[in-house]
A protein has these predicted regions:
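Flexible loop residues that form catalytic
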Residues: 1, 71, 92
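Short glycine-rich anion-binding loops that position phosphate/pyrophosphate groups of nucleotides
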Residues: 1-4, 43
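Conserved ATPase-coupling elements of RecA-like P-loop NTPase cores
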Residues: 3-10, 49-50
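Conserved Class I SAM-dependent methyltransferase catalytic core
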Residues: 14-75, 82-89
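Flexible, glycine-/basic-rich loop-and-beta segments that form/coincide
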Residues: 76-173
Length: 176
């Protein structure tokens, strides 16, 4: 869900999240400690000026890795040209007062972007450039055509760190 509107939910109203940020926060809060969540989102989550949703997520989860997709990644099946990110988060066992580098923005080659992608260019599947968008000039990840996107994605995903922890579940009685 995307849009410039908010969801009314007493538990989250104080955060003033837009709808997509609200769903990220609520989803993460529903995951068990140690659970892993993968979000596909626009670059706005990682690159927008307001860091509040990134702070919220960082206090509750470790960023295992993030991949910036080129703006053509969804063109064939969805008809859109939008720079997107895949975020991999592992829920912490408690909320921590922490603000890692990926909460912040930096400028690289004249383009404002998330510190994580500046520090990890191997996770950017293309080249960040300023392009003319619907609301003026904006940053976009233009595709690297030297390799198929699938090969680039496979390589980037090999850099995502973390481990899967076995969860204990209560067995369901077959006689229900």
């Amino acid at each position: 869900p995307f849009g410039q509107y908010k969801v009314s939910d007493r538990q989250y109203d104080k955060h003033n999240f837009l709808i997509h940020d609200y769903f990220f926060a609520k989803t993460l809060d529903k995951v068990r400690p140690g659970g892993i969540v993968a979000f596909v989102t626009s670059k706005g989550t990682m690159d927008k000026k307001n860091p509040e949703v990134r702070k919220y997520l960082a206090q509750r989860a470790e960023l295992l890795g993030a991949v910036r997709l080129p703006n053509t990644a969804f063109k064939e099946n969805a008809g859109t040209e939008v720079t997107s990110d895949i975020l991999f988060l592992k829920k912490r066992d408690r909320v921590m007062d922490i603000e890692p580098d990926w909460v912040h923005l930096t400028e690289k080659d004249g383009i404002v972007m998330n510190q994580y992608f500046a520090d990890h260019p191997e996770m950017v599947l293309g080249k960040m450039e300023m392009v003319s968008g619907a609301h003026g000039m904006e940053s976009a990840c233009l595709p690297d055509t030297s390799l198929p996107l699938s090969a680039q994605l496979k390589n980037a995903l090999s850099h995502v760190e973390g481990s899967i922890e076995q969860a204990d579940f209560n067995e369901i009685d077959d006689e229900l």
